[in-house]
Amino acid sequence: MSILQSVHNSFTPVHKEGYPFIIAFFVLSLIFGWVWSPLFWCGLVLTVWCIYFFRDPNRVIPVNSNWIISPADGRISFVEPCIPPEELGLGNEEMIRISVFMDIFSCHINRIPISGKVESIVYRPGQFANAELDKASQFNERNGMVIDSKHGKIGVVQIAGAIARRIVCWSKENDSVITGQRFGLIRFGSRLDIYIPTEVKLRVAVGQTAIAGETVLGSFDDKSSATIDFRFD
């Protein structure tokens, strides 16, 4: 490996979605700093924070079709049975909802929790209440995606919060997706809910920190760990 490659690999990439914000903060820093120099340093701090917010690190992804992987970085805020949102079309039977709350310091790149085919994507406008509240899953702006995996259908819902005002989803209906694949982001603090079948063996608890693409939320087969592989992406 060359020296240039070593230097390149030591830096965490920044997602292109963040470029406009980073440039805007830096330009404003120069403009306001010309008026009053302390404002330049304030703006520079915001620019560095913006770079940090839009970081897009590679992850060591466990490749196992029986495992459900966390789609987001953050803290597990809810693990409970509930009926999924009507717009997902997952029926009126209870599923397990796992909620991951992302604060403004979390990495906000969202990843696919399990391989399959995107059956539907449904956007719903709504409020911008605190994403940590239980009612956020019903009343906040959100974007829902249903993945048809070999084990059945799983719902993934991106939920905007009090600060987040922009949900981004790159996946399209009928796309084939794989575990750990990047599929979207939510800008500036938010939550992600995942709805999984009740027969899944849970591997997380409320209060635990989850890492997108790496943390195992649950498994369909307790014996599957013997066949695990990893992918770096």
UniProtKB/Swiss-Prot annotation:
Entry's EC annotation: 4.1.1.65
Broad class of enzyme this protein falls into: lyase
Highest taxon above the source species: Bacteria
PTM text: Is synthesized initially as an inactive proenzyme. Formation of the active enzyme involves a self-maturation process in which the active site pyruvoyl group is generated from an internal serine residue via an autocatalytic post-translational modification. Two non-identical subunits are generated from the proenzyme in this reaction, and the pyruvate is formed at the N-terminus of the alpha chain, which is derived from the carboxyl end of the proenzyme.
GO molecular function: phosphatidylserine decarboxylase activity
Task of the protein: Catalyzes the formation of phosphatidylethanolamine (PtdEtn) from phosphatidylserine (PtdSer).
Family that this chain belongs to: Belongs to the phosphatidylserine decarboxylase family. PSD-A subfamily.
Swiss-Prot/TrEMBL catalytic activity: a 1,2-diacyl-sn-glycero-3-phospho-L-serine + H(+) = a 1,2-diacyl-sn-glycero-3-phosphoethanolamine + CO2
Keyword field: Cell membrane, Decarboxylase, Lipid biosynthesis, Lipid metabolism, Lyase, Membrane, Phospholipid biosynthesis, Phospholipid metabolism, Pyruvate, Zymogen
Any Pfam family the entry gives: PS_Dcarbxylase
Membrane topology note: Peripheral membrane protein
Cofactor field: pyruvate
Pathway: Phospholipid metabolism; phosphatidylethanolamine biosynthesis; phosphatidylethanolamine from CDP-diacylglycerol: step 2/2
Entry GO CC: plasma membrane
Protein name per the record: Phosphatidylserine decarboxylase proenzyme
Subunit (UniProt): Heterodimer of a large membrane-associated beta subunit and a small pyruvoyl-containing alpha subunit.
InterPro entries named among the record's database cross-references: PS_Dcarbxylase, PSD-A
Chain positions found as Pyruvic acid (Ser): 190
GO biological process annotation, one example: phosphatidylethanolamine biosynthetic process
UniProt subcellular location: Cell membrane
Annotated site residue numbers, Cleavage (non-hydrolytic): 189-190
Active site: 190 (schiff-base intermediate with substrate)
